[in-house]
Amino acid sequence: MGEIIEVIYENGILKPLKKLPFKEGEKLIVEVKSTNKEKLLEELKGSIKLGKKVTITRILELEDEVWSSI
């Protein structure tokens, strides 16, 4: 069974943003992914071919345009 759970990292601890559906003492495997867009785009840089140079700043601008039009 897999579930994606949003957390916030504070004072060295991952704190879930909602109540967890697990039993006390249950062992889990955790995969951590950052929601930092700039960091994610930097990691993906070069893996997508667009035929022209596009900066990370422009990609973030386009994302804002798309979401603001919905």
Swiss-Prot record:
InterPro entries xref list: AF2212-like, AF2212-like_dom_sf
Keyword Nucleotide-binding: no
Keywords noted in UniProt: Toxin-antitoxin system
SUPFAM superfamilies, A to Z: AF2212/PG0164-like
Gene3D superfamilies: AF2212/PG0164-like
Domain of life: Archaea
Its job: Possibly the antitoxin component of a type II toxin-antitoxin (TA) system.
Family, similarity comment: Belongs to the UPF0165 family.
Name of the protein in its database record: Putative antitoxin PYRAB08720
Source organism: Pyrococcus abyssi (strain GE5 / Orsay)
Higher taxonomy: Archaea, Methanobacteriati, Methanobacteriota, Thermococci, Thermococcales
